[in-house]
């Protein structure tokens, strides 16, 4: 039986990035796959502005955990198959401790396939996402575990693998993001670009109008050339990753404690 682990930095990250492939694997092929989710944080600070500071922290983390559980009911993924790493939203580090946690987790779970945020050529440069993907990639690239599972990145600017779905199944995505009520302020603005990007990805897959795009990462020497991306993507990523992107308004005492 194939085990697949979906890594995410925050509880709502997978819904319009991997929602369709997750639903297919978990509901239409559930006898053949074990699906798990590894959530690095509980999204404790996922509200905009200091006016919401009284809700941020443990309370919001509990609420967003329930929202995640409600969303995964749609996929028939039970809470027992959702693991939390306990890192704080906005403070996911690319450090030895985090890498060791990833190693221990992969050695224990032994997944055959991993989905994770794009670590290098990403269109979404939130550092929690980037560091999650970087840590997973670092472990596999440096052979820090005794086998190499298949790795697929989502939010990639250079996808090479596509999972097709029908237009009517866009309702699945709407249903998933509606479960994350605390994130409506953000997610309501994402559906228009989501429809555009999934429609564009569908053009890459014969016989489909919509698709979820992923980048399969190759580790065997004979396939390393397949990891090469265009010069334009490399230049764009270099520029894009250097921009001063928005950071959540964390309480001052928390920022001081985490310097």
Regions found by a protein language model. Give the residues of each.
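Active-site rim/loop-helix segments in enzyme catalytic domains that contact anionic ligands
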Residues: 1-109, 141-142, 234-256
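Metal-dependent de-N-acetylase/amidase catalytic core
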Residues: 2-5, 92-259
């Amino acid at each position: 039986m194939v085990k697949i682990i979906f890594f995410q930095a925050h509880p709502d990250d997978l819904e319009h990035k991997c929602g369709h492939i997750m639903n297919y694997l978990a509901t239409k092929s559930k006898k053949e796959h074990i699906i798990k989710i590894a959530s690095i944080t509980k999204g404790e600070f996922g509200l905009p502005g200091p006016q919401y500071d009284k809700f941020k922290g443990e309370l919001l983390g509990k609420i967003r955990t329930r929202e995640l559980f409600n969303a995964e009911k749609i996929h028939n993924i039970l809470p027992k198959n959702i693991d939390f790493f306990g890192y704080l939203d906005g403070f996911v580090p690319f450090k030895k401790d985090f890498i060791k946690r990833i190693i221990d987790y992969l050695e224990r779970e032994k997944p055959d396939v991993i989905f994770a945020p794009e670590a290098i050529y990403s269109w979404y440069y939130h550092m929690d996402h980037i560091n999650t993907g970087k840590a997973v990639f670092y472990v596999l690239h440096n052979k820090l575990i005794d086998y190499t599972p298949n790795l697929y990145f989502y939010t990639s600017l250079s996808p090479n693998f596509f999972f097709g779905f029908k237009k009517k199944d866009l309702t699945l995505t709407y249903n998933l993001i509606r479960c994350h009520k605390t994130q409506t302020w953000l997610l309501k603005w994402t559906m228009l670009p989501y429809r555009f990007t999934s429609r564009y990805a569908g053009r890459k897959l014969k016989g489909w109008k919509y698709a979820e795009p992923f980048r399969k990462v190759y580790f065997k020497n004979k396939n390393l050339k397949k990891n090469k991306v265009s010069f334009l993507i490399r230049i764009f990523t270099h520029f894009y990753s250097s921009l001063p992107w928005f950071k959540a308004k964390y309480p001052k005492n928390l920022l001081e404690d985490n310097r």
